[in-house]
Amino acid sequence: MMRLTIIGFGNQARAWGLNLKDSNFPVRIALRSKNASFEGATSSGLEAVEIGSSDFFQDEIFALLIPDQLHVEFLKNHGEHFRPGTTILYAHGYSLLKHQFELLYPHINHVLFAPKSIGTELRKQFLIEGKLGAVYSTEHFHGDSLLFEQWMKNFSKAIGINLGPYRTTIKNETEADLYSEQGLLCSLIPYAASEMFRGLTDKGIEPELAYFECWHELKLIVNAMVDVGPKGFFDLISPNALIGSEKGYQKLFTPAFQNNLNSLFSEIQDGSFNQEIDEANVEEIRNRIINRWKASPLQLTFEKMKQENP
C-alpha cells in the first residue's frame, strides 16, 4: 500500500493522520522544521518529515492540508520539485478551481478528496464508527486510474468514510461547499438561533430554557434528520411541531429569502466572492465576529451552564 504524506497538522490534517494510523494505513506528516506542530505530530505516534528535504519527495501521493490561501505559495516553492506522476490530494476544491494548478504544474496529478466534515468531527466520528461522507474528483489525474482508485478506496475506508465517496467535479464541490456555508451552516443556523434566543429572553423566558430550545436541541434535531431522512423526520415530529413547521415555512421562506439565496450562489459563480476573499482582512473579520459572539447573551449563557454542569 502506497504511503500518504500529509502536508500540515491542523485540525483536518491531524484527523486524517490519526485515523489512518489507527487503521494501520501507511502515513506520515510533513512540516517545516521549526513548526511547533512537529513535536505534536511525533508525540501522537506519527512519523514526521521536513518539507523540502530529500526524504520529503520520496512518496508518490501527498495531501495538501494547509489553509487554502497558502496553497499558491507552497506550490510556488515546491511544485517543480515533485516527480512527474506525483499525486496531490486537496480536501476542498477552492484553490484548485481558482488557480488552475493543473495548468501551472501539469506534471502533478491534482485530485480532490473532500470529507464532508470539519476535522474534529472527522476524528470523533471515526472513533465512534459514525457516519462520514466524502466526494472526490479525478478529472486532473492522468496516471493508471484503476490502480489509483483502488488505492483511494482503501484510503477512504481507512480514514473512516462510510458514505461514498461519491464522484463529483472540482467546480461542483467548491460551489456547493461555499454556498452551504454562506446560506445555511455558518450563517442561517447560528444567527437564527441567536436571534431566537434573544427574542425568548426579551419576552421573559429563562436563559437556560431558551438555550435548550434554540441551541442545545439543534444537535438532537439534526441527528434525527440525518438518521431518518426528510420524510421520516416530518413523520416523527409531534402534531404541534408539524403544524408549527408549516406555519414557519410559509412566513419565513418568502420570495425575498429565495432571492437572497440565489444572490449568494450567483456571487460565488461569477467570481465576486473570490474577490471579497482576496480583499478581506481575515484576522480583522475573525476578531470582529469572535468579539460579537463573545459578548452575546447566548454565549454567556452557554459558559454559565457549562461551568455549572462540568
Question: What do the PLM-derived regions correspond to, one by one?
Answer:
Residues 90-179:
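Rossmann-fold dinucleotide-binding core
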Residues 1-49:
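NAD(P)+-binding Rossmann beta1-loop-alpha1 motif at the extreme N-terminus of oxidoreductases
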Residues 32-34, 52-55, 92-94, 115-118, ...:
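Short, acidic/turn-prone active-site loops that include or flank metal/cofactor-
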Residues 19-22, 44, 77-80, 102-106, ...:
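Short, glycine/charged-enriched secondary-structure capping and boundary segments
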